[in-house]
C-alpha cells in the first residue's frame, strides 16, 4: 500500500501532532481547533476500543465536543485493528474532511500507524489466529521471557530491540518467522532496500513532535496520571470488561498498557502496589519506545512539551490561523 496521495497545489500539508503518552497532545490539539475548523483523526491504537475510557486516557465528553474526532470508539475490545485498517480509514477521512472545507489534524502516539500512512505498509505475512493462540498458550506455560529467548535464537536482531515482556511484538516476530521461515529483521531490511513509495514525493506532512526536555519530569507526570486513573475507577473499568466473559489477556485490547497489569491484579497474580508499579513502568517503557520512533523521524518540528508556552509554539508551527 502506498503513502496517502496529496495534491500540494490545492491542499496545505496534513499537520500531524505526535508525542509520547502524557505529553499534552489533547490540550494542544484543542488549541489548534480554536484556530481553524479542525477535525481530529486519532493516531492511537488504544482509543479505537469502546468500553475502554479511563485506562486509555480517552478525551472527555467536553473535549470530544470541542472538535469533531475520528477513529475513537470504533471497535469492540474483542476485535482487533491494524495499521492497514488505519491507513484505509485515514485516507478516507482526510479526503472527506477536506471535501467539507475543514482541516484534518492527525493526533496521537502510535508511530507504526504514522509510518504506515506516510511511507506505506510492508508485505509481511498476515496474522494467523491459530498460531497466535498456540504462542499465547506457550507463553502462559513458560512466560514471555522464554519466548523472547526463542526469538533470540531465530532472529537475534529483532530480539535485541525488544524487552523480554513485550508480548505483542515477540509474538508477531515469532509468527512471521514460523510463517515465512525467515527472520522479520531480514524481511524488513530487504523491503527497505527496494522500496519506493508511490506518492511519497508529492505528499507533504507537517510533523510537530511533543518531546520532553526532562524525561524524569515526564515520568513524574506519567505516575501522577496513572494514579489518577486508579482513583477514577480504572480497576472497576477492567472488572466490567472481565465480566463480559469473552475477553482475555491475549487480545490486543487487554494488552494495552495498564489493562494487562490491572487484569493480572484481578487474577490475584499481583498485589495493588505491584500492579501500580508495573503499570507505571509499562507506561514509561511505552513512552521510551514512542520517543525512539519520533527521533527517527527527521522531518519533525520539535516542541518541548514541558515548556510553559508549548501550546503557543504548536499553534505557530501548525500555522492554522493564516
UniProtKB/Swiss-Prot annotation:
Record-listed ATP binding positions: 19-26
GO-annotated molecular function: ATP binding; tRNA dimethylallyltransferase activity
Cofactor entry: Mg(2+)
Matches recorded under InterPro entries: Dimethylallyltransferase, IPT, P-loop_NTPase
UniProt site (Interaction with substrate tRNA): 110, 132
Listed EC numbers: 2.5.1.75
Interaction with substrate tRNA: annotated span: 44-47, 168-172, 255-260
Keywords: ATP-binding, Magnesium, Nucleotide-binding, Transferase, tRNA processing
Annotated GO biological process: tRNA modification
Reactions catalysed, as given in the entry: adenosine(37) in tRNA + dimethylallyl diphosphate = N(6)-dimethylallyladenosine(37) in tRNA + diphosphate
Binding site for substrate: 21-26
Function: Catalyzes the transfer of a dimethylallyl group onto the adenine at position 37 in tRNAs that read codons beginning with uridine, leading to the formation of N6-(dimethylallyl)adenosine (i(6)A).
Family according to the record: Belongs to the IPP transferase family.
Assembly and interaction partners: Monomer.
Name of the protein in question: tRNA dimethylallyltransferase
